[in-house]
């Protein structure tokens, strides 16, 4: 808020509906301390009574209307209520702790939007059963069309990874790798099942060609660190920098090294075919290093999987450096901080996270923030303070989705972890500096002749100017909803669609609440449009987005089919 007394900041007026301007002036200008003082003291109830419900149903309003980012921070209020409806989607990994139908129902109630299946573990039979359970749990809510919650299913590929061999004592044995000792890293087949404390076999045959003297080799998520001293005919002679206990089949990372592994392994191809056969909605493509890796996944999905969204996981230095070309051919990005924190220095991970989220926001593509978000909740009922801040800052950075891994796959508190992410996200979303965010996104938007894109940015701007409580969009493929999400409206985007897959996939986009409309089309198309819009309004009222008297922006097409969105209306909820 401006510190001038008895004047309302000019930048505030675009946020206040024209018919409310005179009322706002009379309510604020005569207050002690002027408008700024009034807004700092007034309760939400007072503001709601004087300026209308829709404008003030979102919280942290004084901070959201601040003139500068520093002032925005100063005006954040810990006693302000969180937003009514969470906009950031929650991805939960499904595993032994969460794959039962009853537990999945609890997680859906708690706020899970996307169920992730990690194909680094488990057989196809195991994952087929998990998919069946997820769908059964989801459909158990279908008795009420207005409260039905579509849940997307994501397949996370194993990806092109490097692993050690089996130790001499068998798959369950372990050996101690002692700091300062010498270890031979070899590709000689005779050591594939005969590893020990002095010799470690790896399954990457070109390792001697790509790793230089002085380079590092990390084993088992970086717990063991080796420094290359010499490259010989038998392999790499290394010195142990950090020792530890080594088991069989552990992951190997080669930081700052461009490896020439194929983008897809044979197992990945089988897994992708499985995903197409079981109608998964999203592919999380692991260890993407360049654009051609993404195109290989698209080719593997084939015509039957052409509508599956591909989210590229950035987990290595090469992927970060080639981020723009990867983003261009991907449907979205996952900031996979686990392996990324091994491949690049841990203190630089936050830089990579902010860079990738920012570029995704500018490109209008979904971005997921993942790994160790609430790691302590694997064994504890409450997260650490640092973890809650990490989740909140991912939301403030602009992530569309936040992900839980071991917390829900194997943890003791999977439902509580989802509930905690839900609560943190609601608080963080209220603290977003929407005014600055929309202005920057609008300025950065290139000129466009695409009617759908132009209509989307106009609808978001109109939602700010008339203080709309929601934007209702009728969509066939979900593209219109994603374009609206791109400009980050404060209003909820209620996406009404007849496509079950589109309803599930729009969870990737922030602030979009999908509604699956199951009624058959009306004979007269205009009547069908009105019925779907009314369905969106009734659902919004049921979920608390809308109240009688609120304004909503309605975005529709001028004819049936996809690609014809170009009509925007303003309606009052009755």
Curated annotation (Swiss-Prot):
Amino-acid positions noted as binding beta-D-fructose 1,6-bisphosphate in the UniProt annotation, renumbered to this chain: 475-480, 525, 532, 559-564
Activity regulation text: Allosterically activated by fructose 1,6-bisphosphate.
One family name in Pfam for this protein: PK_C
Keyword check for Phosphoprotein: yes
Binding-site positions, Mn(2+): 315, 339
Enzyme class: transferase
EC number: 2.7.1.40
Cross-referenced SUPFAM superfamilies: Phosphoenolpyruvate/pyruvate domain, PK beta-barrel domain-like, PK C-terminal domain-like
UniProt keyword terms in alphabetical order: Allosteric enzyme, ATP-binding, Glycolysis, Kinase, Magnesium, Manganese, Metal-binding, Nucleotide-binding, Phosphoprotein, Potassium, Pyruvate, Transferase
Binding site for ATP: 118-121, 163, 250
Signal sequence annotation: none
Catalytic activity: pyruvate + ATP = phosphoenolpyruvate + ADP + H(+)
GO biological process: cellular response to epinephrine stimulus; cellular response to insulin stimulus; glycolytic process; pyruvate biosynthetic process; response to ATP; response to cAMP; response to glucose; response to hypoxia
Chain residues that bind substrate: 116, 313, 338-339, 371
Residues carrying the site annotation Transition state stabilizer: 313
Gene3D superfamilies in the record: Phosphoenolpyruvate-binding domains (3.20.20.60), PK beta-barrel domain-like (2.40.33.10), Pyruvate kinase, C-terminal domain (3.40.1380.20)
GO MF: ATP binding; kinase activity; magnesium ion binding; monosaccharide binding; potassium ion binding; pyruvate kinase activity
InterPro entries for this protein: Pyr_Knase, Pyrv/PenolPyrv_kinase-like_dom, Pyrv_kinase-like_dom_sf, Pyrv_Knase-like_insert_dom_sf, Pyrv_Knase_AS, Pyrv_Knase_brl, Pyrv_Knase_C, Pyrv_Knase_C_sf
Modification type Phosphoserine: residues: 2, 19, 26, 43, 292
Family: Belongs to the pyruvate kinase family.
Primary role: Pyruvate kinase that catalyzes the conversion of phosphoenolpyruvate to pyruvate with the synthesis of ATP, and which plays a key role in glycolysis.
Note: There are 4 isozymes of pyruvate kinase in mammals: L, R, M1 and M2. L type is major isozyme in the liver, R is found in red cells, M1 is the main form in muscle, heart and brain, and M2 is found in early fetal tissues.
Name used for this protein in its record: Pyruvate kinase PKLR
Organism: Rattus norvegicus (Rat)
């Amino acid at each position: 808020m401006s510190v001038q007394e008895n004047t309302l900041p000019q930048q505030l007026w675009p946020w206040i509906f024209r018919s409310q301007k005179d009322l706002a002036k009379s309510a604020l200008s005569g207050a002690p301390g002027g408008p700024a003082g009034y807004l700092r003291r007034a309760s939400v109830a007072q503001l709601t009574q004087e300026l209308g419900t829709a404008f003030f149903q979102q919280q942290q309003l004084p901070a959201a209307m601040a003139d500068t980012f520093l002032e925005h921070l100063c005006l954040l209020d810990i006693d302000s209520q969180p937003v009514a409806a969470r906009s950031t989607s929650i991805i939960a990994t499904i595993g032994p702790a969460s794959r039962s139908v009853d537990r999945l129902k609890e997680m859906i109630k708690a706020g899970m939007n996307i169920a992730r299946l990690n194909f680094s573990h488990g057989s196809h039979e195991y994952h087929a059963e998990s998919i069946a359970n997820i769908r059964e749990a989801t459909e158990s809510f279908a008795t009420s069309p207005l409260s039905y919650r579509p849940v997307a299913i994501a397949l996370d590929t194993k990806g092109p990874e490097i692993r050690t061999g089996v130790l001499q004592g068998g798959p369950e044995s372990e050996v101690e790798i002692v700091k300062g000792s010498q270890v031979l890293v070899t590709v000689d087949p005779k050591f594939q099942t005969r590893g020990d404390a002095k010799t470690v076999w790896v399954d990457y045959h070109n390792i001697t060609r790509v790793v230089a003297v002085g380079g590092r080799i990390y084993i088992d998520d970086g717990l063991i660190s080796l420094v290359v001293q010499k490259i010989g005919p038998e392999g790499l002679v290394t010195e142990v920098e950090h020792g530890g206990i080594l088991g069989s089949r552990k992951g190997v990372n080669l930081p700052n090294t461009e490896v020439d592994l194929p983008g897809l392994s044979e197992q990945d191809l089988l897994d992708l075919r499985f995903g197409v056969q079981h109608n998964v909605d999203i592919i999380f493509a692991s260890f993407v290093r360049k654009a051609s890796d993404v195109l290989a996944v698209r080719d593997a999905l084939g015509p039957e999987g052409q509508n599956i969204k591909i989210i590229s996981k950035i987990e290595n230095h090469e992927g970060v450096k080639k981020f723009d070309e990867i983003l261009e051919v991907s449907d979205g990005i996952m900031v996979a901080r686990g392996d990324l924190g091994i491949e690049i220095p841990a203190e630089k991970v936050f830089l990579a996270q902010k860079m990738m989220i920012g570029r995704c926001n500018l490109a209008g593509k979904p971005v997921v923030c993942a790994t160790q978000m609430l790691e302590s909740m694997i064994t504890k009922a409450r997260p650490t303070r640092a973890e809650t801040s990490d989740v909140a800052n991912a939301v403030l950075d602009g992530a569309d989705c936040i992900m839980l891994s071991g917390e829900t796959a194997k943890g003791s508190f999977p439902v509580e972890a989802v509930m905690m992410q839900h609560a943190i996200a609601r608080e963080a979303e209220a603290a977003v500096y929407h005014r600055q965010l929309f202005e920057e996104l609008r300025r950065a938007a290139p000129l466009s002749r695409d009617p759908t894109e132009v209509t989307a940015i106009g609808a978001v701007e109109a939602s700010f100017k008339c203080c709309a409580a929601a934007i209702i969009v009728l969509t066939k493929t979900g593209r219109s909803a994603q374009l609206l999400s791109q400009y980050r409206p404060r209003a909820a985007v209620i996406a009404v669609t007849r496509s079950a897959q589109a309803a599930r996939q729009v969870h990737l986009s922030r602030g979009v609440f999908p509604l699956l409309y199951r009624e058959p089309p009306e004979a007269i198309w205009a009547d069908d449009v009105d019925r779907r819009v009314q369905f969106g309004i009734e659902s919004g009222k049921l979920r608390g987005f809308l109240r009688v008297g609120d304004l909503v922006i309605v975005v529709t097409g001028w004819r049936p089919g996809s690609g014809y969105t170009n009509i925007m209306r303003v309606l009052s909820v009755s």
